[in-house]
């Protein structure tokens, strides 16, 4: 009688699925091939950068400028060697012709050849060093020697970490920035054993960061 008065009806027991929300924590994980550590092979002082964690970067854009006296010295050494190489090549060709006509001794010719080859090796090695700091040896001249060099973004992606500040000297082995290519990004989530049965491959997940909880990202368990 009381059930009727309360307008409550009863029926047979049924097995129903009840939805629930499971909140779990984790961290963003990226395959090694999608992570890039940016360093300066010859070291130097960080002159400028605008990078912050989370910023988007485009491949080829300037992400930092470095400054050091050794950059000037390297450019000077290359241009000096290049100039000496030009005359060494001329002298080598001259001594070669003289030697063929027996107007010059083998010793003089061989010395000219050795000098030319040595300078050619030195020039090539210095040119490769210039490429390491993003200076094109083919366009370098006495008119555009600079104590500053740019660092360019090697990938399209996001800044994961900034490990340096303006004015700091960085060694060749130091990492300035860590970048992420998000094309294969995934979440590494930690789940309690009692909750494992609540999850399944293909299940949809809604993810967000503590810094930006309003920005939700649709994910899927794989």
Residues of each region from the PLM?
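Acidic, gly/proline-rich low-complexity N-terminal segments at the extreme N terminus
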Residues: 1-24, 132-153, 207
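Short, intrinsically disordered, charge-balanced linker/junction segments flanking boundaries
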Residues: 1-2, 217-222
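Long, amphipathic coiled-coil "stalk"/hairpin helices in large membrane-associated assemblies
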Residues: 3-7, 15-77, 160-165, 172-174, ...
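Flexible glycine-/small-residue-rich
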Residues: 28-30, 153, 181, 189-193, ...
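Elongated periplasmic alpha-helical coiled-coil
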Residues: 41, 129-168, 183-185
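Alpha-helical hairpins and coiled-coil heptad-repeat segments
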Residues: 65, 69-72, 79-123, 136
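Low-complexity, intrinsically disordered
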Residues: 165, 182, 201-218
């Amino acid at each position: 009688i009381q059930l009727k008065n309360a307008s409550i009806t009863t029926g047979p027991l049924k097995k129903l699925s009840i939805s629930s929300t499971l909140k779990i924590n984790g961290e963003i994980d990226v395959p090694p091939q999608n992570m890039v550590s940016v360093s300066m092979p010859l070291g130097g002082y960080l002159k400028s950068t605008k990078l912050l964690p989370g910023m988007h970067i485009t491949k080829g854009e300037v992400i930092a400028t470095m400054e050091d006296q050794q950059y000037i010295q390297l450019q000077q050494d290359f241009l000096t060697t290049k100039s000496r190489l030009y005359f060494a090549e001329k002298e080598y060709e001259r001594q070669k012709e003289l030697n063929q006509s027996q107007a010059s001794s083998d010793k003089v010719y061989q010395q000219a050849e050795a000098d030319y080859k040595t300078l050619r090796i030195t020039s090539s090695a210095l040119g490769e060093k210039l490429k390491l700091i993003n200076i094109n040896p083919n366009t370098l001249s006495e008119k555009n020697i600079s104590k500053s060099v740019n660092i360019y973004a090697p990938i399209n992606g996001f800044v994961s970490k900034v490990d340096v500040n303006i004015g700091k000297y960085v060694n060749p082995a130091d990492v300035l920035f860590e970048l992420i290519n998000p094309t294969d990004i995934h979440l590494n989530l930690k789940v309690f054993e009692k909750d494992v049965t609540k999850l399944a491959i293909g299940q949809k997940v809604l993810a967000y960061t503590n810094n930006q909880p309003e920005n939700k990202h649709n994910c899927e368990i794989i």
